[in-house]
Design a protein with these regions (language model features):
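Short N-terminal micro-motifs specific to bacterial/archaeal maturation
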Residues: 1-2, 68, 172
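Generic hydrophobic alpha-helical segments
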Residues: 17-18, 84, 115, 180
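Cell wall/extracellular polymer interaction/catalysis modules
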Residues: 28-122, 135-138, 145
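Exported/periplasmic cell-wall-interacting domains
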Residues: 63, 96-99, 103-104, 116-197
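C-terminal segment of classical bacterial N-terminal signal peptides
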Residues: 20-22
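Boundary at the C-terminal end of the N-terminal hydrophobic targeting segment
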Residues: 24-26
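N-terminal secretory signal peptides and thylakoid transit peptides that target proteins
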Residues: 1-17
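Short, flexible active-site-adjacent loop segments at beta-strand->alpha-helix junctions, enriched
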Residues: 16, 74, 112, 153, ...
């Protein structure tokens, strides 16, 4: 199967120009930005410069059901379709500490549009003020779509808080912009391979 390299380059280039907020493209030290915005901007620039198109072969023996690679260092999620016609690269949020980070092989076992959310017992222990349940909606931390992994409590999901993307900001899950999880949701299937490195 011939891989459409033009499409790959276009998707990656489009992502780089469209998903970088305007303030991230401006002068970091301008008087118009707050200290927090300056730090976020520096982080996004560093992360964006580390995005590289990857070949799937060093990570997977095949592309049966498609494959997702999450790189914790570059804070990027790579997706390859089973027929190799589609390769997408998305910025992501990753766990905020090594304690919350799980690495290894898993797979998508369930797909949910409009997911509800229940914090894990350890989340409630760390944050007793959090609700025990949250229905789908704009306050839901899982965003608009969720891919449930075979590991208990682990998901690839959207987020309504776009400040989290490109940062170590999650409690263990991998977060994407809602627009990106919507696209990834449509491309993946139950059984899609997942590797977190």
């Amino acid at each position: 199967v011939k891989v459409d390299r033009y499409r790959r380059s276009f998707v990656i280039a489009s992502f780089a120009s469209v998903s970088t907020p305007i303030w991230a493209q401006s002068d970091v030290n301008s008087d118009d930005t707050t200290e927090i915005e300056q730090e976020i901007t520096k982080t996004q620039r560093r992360n964006l410069s580390s995005f590289r198109a990857l070949d799937w072969r060093p990570y997977f023996s095949n592309l049966k059901n498609g494959a997702i690679l999450v790189d914790m260092t570059s804070r990027a999620l790579h997706f390859w379709s089973e027929d190799e016609d589609i390769y997408n690269l998305y910025p992501s949020s990753v766990p905020m500490s090594d304690e919350l980070t799980r690495r290894g092989r898993t797979k998508v076992v369930k797909k949910v549009e409009g997911p509800s959310w229940r914090p894990t017992p350890s989340m409630l222990e760390r944050n007793p003020e959090w609700p025990e349940f949250m229905p789908p909606g704009p306050e839901n931390p899982l965003g608009t779509h969720a891919l449930y992994l075979s590991w208990q409590y682990y998901r690839i999901h959207g987020t309504h808080d776009t400040r989290k993307i490109g940062r170590r900001s999650s409690n263990g899950c991998i977060g994407l912009y809602n627009e990106h999880i919507n696209e990834l949701f449509s491309l993946t299937k139950v059984g899609t391979q997942v590797l977190l490195i």
